[in-house]
A protein has these predicted regions:
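Interface amphipathic segments
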Residues: 1-186
Length: 186
């Protein structure tokens, strides 16, 4: 039971230290190692809501499965690369193992309502993907006004030059609004 935590010091992860004021509503049912949780979190970095089942939570390879919603979450601040990444709003089903390292794996099936990338905010993206430390396998369908495409395949980033096996159908890609080409240089 959760009473096992009574009197134990809690170490705050670096990420939470930069989150500013954190408002957290958390319901947990189960043991430390296997529990159901409902979470609503609001921070200066954005908002998170989740309904998850955690297994092996105290082990080296925690497993999780459930539903996740991100609202206006600042990926740039979290990753330390605000020049490339902006904010994300997304909702979907999630299943995974670990939170980093060589055994990390996450599967996501849902919708990215907005994603800031390279100074442009993409909208209306459907994503079904399996992702590991160096591998992406999945399907991305973008219905953004400036980027309409379907990607289905695999990219392995573990080598010096990524190994790619995919099919892409590109309907529209407006390079200037997307910030891929600056000004009228074409």
């Amino acid at each position: 039971p959760i009473t096992e935590l009574a009197g134990e010091p809690v170490e705050i992860p670096e990420l939470l230290k930069s989150a500013g004021i954190v408002r957290l509503q958390l319901n947990v049912n189960g043991s430390l190692n296997d529990f159901q949780t409902e979470l609503n979190g609001q921070t200066d970095l954005g908002n998170v809501a989740a309904k998850l089942h955690m297994k092996n939570a105290t082990g080296s390879k925690p497993e999780y499965e459930g539903w996740l919603e991100l609202h206006n979450l600042n990926l740039g601040a979290i990753s330390g690369d605000s020049s490339l990444l902006g904010r994300i709003s997304a909702v979907g089903e999630i299943r995974g193992q670990g939170f980093g390292g060589p055994d990390f794996f996450v599967a996501f099936d849902g919708k990215i309502n907005r994603l800031g990338l390279n100074s442009y905010t993409y909208t209306n993206i459907e994503l079904t993907a399996d992702m590991g430390p160096s591998i992406f396998t999945g399907r991305i369908q973008s219905n953004d006004p400036h980027a309409q495409f379907l990607f289905n395949g695999r990219i392995d980033f573990s080598k010096e030059h990524p190994d790619m096996d995919f099919i892409a159908n590109l309907s529209r890609l407006d390079l200037i609004p997307l910030g891929i080409i600056l000004g009228d240089s074409i």
